[in-house]
Each structure stands twice: as structure tokens, then as C-alpha cells.
């Protein structure tokens, strides 16, 4: 046996949820460009879970189901309030909150398709509120109740900031949610499928996925981009800062991709929203810095920006704390994780790969008295 490190290029399963072929991302056969410009996030949720777009009645029913389950349980609010959250990683808080949701759900270990779908609704509905509640509680603020007349994008911004978002803010966040909803068999999605393939429950699968996303090699790149932009500070500092990093052969966050060789198709949508939002907020320097960095890196390294690069300035312009960027990734990717979990349950086989052993061979046991 010969191992493929990182499983790069290994086809591990079949899936009908999303695909990446020739640098084109599709959800259930629909091009990401088409969906981003025309769909709501709720339509994407339905598409990923049912493998088809909803009609008006089906979409309205899904929205009502999500609205009904959107409130954060008081037990989790009290849990957040019982800790000093100053040094708590938001992803650790979210991971723990998902486990608590499982404890509070009487159907947690009921494994039939109908119960699993109901749990998927609860998880998708509650996760935005969990992130918003954590953010407010650690600032000494009370959580804001979600509005039944708002969709997920509107409600998240409303419950996070405590004020009605503008139409352009809702548009930007809706697009960001769609663009991050699924991405074939990435690390966290694969983790979720491995977990539930043992016939563990859906909450365990999502908790495992969040644990994988917490790692900086998967989630967190856009937070790194915003840290870089903050360090640069002004547009005129961008070129010397980036060239100094390139001379030292240091990594520039937000460029290149493991799968896309000629450019991430999601990046251009966030680039446009970054331009519009930063102009709206009067902080166009974030966009202008990003443009300057992109010009240098693509020229010098031949690396195009990925989805993380412009999402940083988009989220910053929406008033989102930088350490919440990865939890927001989870808010969106929840739809994809749940789609893959439901798909795994529907046609399950335990995932059990092999390892190429590289350790010593044919050793003889030595009594402890005789060991050096």
C-alpha cells in the first residue's frame, strides 16, 4: 500500500450535493454564479437538502420551520453567562453549544429520516442565534430575539448588532452565506461524514465538523486576512508590507487554493460586495488595500485570491468582530454539513481507510529489567 498524504486527489465517496470540476463550483448542478446572483440562502438550504430548488409553497414552509426554531434556548444563554468569555475562542463556545443543543433535544438519538430532518431544521435555525448571542453576552449585552419576518441573513445581522440591517448589508451577507454553503468533500464535511457513518447522532457529526473547522488550516483564513489589513493600516503601506513578506517567503493569507488551480469562482462576488460596502461605510481603504495586494501577489506569485480574501473586508464592513469570521463560516456551512450528513445516513457505509505503516518491524519484546 502507498499512502497519499492529505488524501489529495483521492476520491473517497460519491455525492450529489456539490461538485468542483475545471474550477467551476456547482450546487446540485447549478453554477455558483447563477445561484449567488439570484437565490436566497433559504433556497440554497432547500436545494442542498432536497437536491432540487423549492417552489413557492415549499420555500415558505421551510422559512416558517426555520423561524419557529430560531430562538436560542435559555439554558444555553445561561451557560454563556456562567463563564468569563473574555478568553474563550468563539469556535470552542459554538462547539460546546451544539453539544448542549443535543442534550436538550429529546429526539437526539432518534435516527429515522423524519427525525433527522427535524434536527437539521433546528440546527440550521439556531446556529446564527448562538453566534450572535455569544458575541453580545461577552460584551455585557443581552441577546436579541430573532424576528419571525426576517430570513437568516437579516436575522443574523439584526440579532448581532441589535439594529435593522440595510438592504445592501442583507444582500452582501446573503451572498456570503450562499458562497460558503458547501464545497464538496472539504476537511470538516469529510469529518462529519466519517462521524455519522458510525451511526452516531447528527449533533455529534456537527460537533466533529466544527472541531475540524476550528483548525487554522481550514477555517480562519479570512480572519488572518483582516489581521494583515489591520497591520498594513493605510493603502500606501500595502506594497512595501507585501513585498517584504514575499522577500522573506512568508505566506500571504487569502491566496491560492488546494483545489482551484486558476482561480476561486467565489472570490469575484465578494470582491464586488467589498467595493460596495466599504464605499457605503466610508472605509474604502479596506477595499483599496485589498486591490493593491491582489495586484502584487497575482503578478509576483501567479496566485489568484480565494473566497477568504475579500470576505474579510465584507465581514468587517458589516460590523462583525474579526474572531467571529470562522463561526460565521459555520453558520453558512451548516447547510452543507447537514446535506452531507443526511446523504450519508441515506446510503451509509462505515468509512474505514487503511494506513501505510512506516514504523519498525519484527521487534522482540524485552523485559523492562533488560532495557537500556
From Swiss-Prot:
Substrates-to-products reaction catalysed: oxaloacetate + acetyl-CoA + H2O = citrate + CoA + H(+)
Keyword annotations: Allosteric enzyme, Phosphoprotein, Transferase, Tricarboxylic acid cycle
One Pfam family recorded for the sequence: Citrate_synt
UniProt modified residues of type Phosphoserine: 284
Entry's Gene Ontology BP terms: carbohydrate metabolic process; tricarboxylic acid cycle
Pathway field: Carbohydrate metabolism; tricarboxylic acid cycle; isocitrate from oxaloacetate: step 1/2
Any one of the GO CC terms: cytoplasm
Signal peptide range: none
Name the UniProt record assigns to this protein: Citrate synthase 2
Originating gene: citZ
